[in-house]
C-alpha cells in the first residue's frame, strides 16, 4: 500500500471518528408516574378538570403535568406522583421494581398499555379517590 493511500485512509477514519464523537442520542429514565383516564381525572381533580403543562416530554404531544396524586398500596404510599398528559383511554401507573416492594404490589414488567392481569392500586387526589382494579406495571425497557 502506498503512502498516499495510507494518508487518505487515515484521514477518512479520523473524520468518521470525529463525526461519531459529536453524535449523541438523548436518553431518559422515567421516574414513577401515572397516565389517567378522563373519568378518573374527573374523580381525582373534579368534573371537567384540565391538566396544566409543567414541561414537554420527548414524545410529541405528551407532557408532564403540574398535577400529582398519591399512590396507596397494601404496604406503603408514594406522595406527589406526577401525572403525564394528555388523558388516556385507561389509567395506568408505572413504577420501578423497588417501588413495587415498597408499595407491596407484584407489578409485572411489561410494555405500556399491556394492562390485562396487572394489579390495581388506590389513587388519591385533592377531590377524590379512585380504586384501580388493574393498571400497575413496571415498564419494560423501550425506545420512543
Predicted regions and their residues:
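Short beta-strand-centered segments at strand-helix junctions
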Residues: 26-74, 79-126, 130-144
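Short, low-complexity, charged amphipathic interaction modules
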Residues: 1-21
Amino acid at each position: 500500500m502506498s503512502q498516499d493511500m495510507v494518508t487518505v485512509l487515515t484521514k477518512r477514519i479520523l473524520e468518521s471518528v470525529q463525526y461519531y464523537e459529536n453524535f449523541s442520542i438523548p436518553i431518559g429514565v422515567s421516574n414513577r408516574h401515572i397516565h389517567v383516564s378522563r373519568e378518573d381525572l374527573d374523580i381525582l381533580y373534579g368534573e371537567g378538570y384540565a391538566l396544566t403543562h409543567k414541561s414537554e416530554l420527548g414524545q410529541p404531544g405528551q407532557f408532564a403535568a403540574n398535577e400529582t396524586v398519591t399512590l396507596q398500596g397494601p404496604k406503603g404510599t408514594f406522595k406527589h406522583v406526577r401525572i403525564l398528559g394528555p388523558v388516556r383511554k385507561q389509567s395506568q401507573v408505572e413504577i420501578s421494581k423497588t417501588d413495587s416492594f415498597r408499595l407491596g404490589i407484584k407489578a409485572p414488567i411489561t410494555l405500556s398499555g399491556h394492562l390485562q392481569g396487572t394489579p390495581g392500586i388506590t389513587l388519591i387526589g385533592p377531590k377524590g379517590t379512585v380504586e384501580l382494579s388493574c393498571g400497575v406495571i413496571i415498564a419494560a425497557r423501550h425506545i420512543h
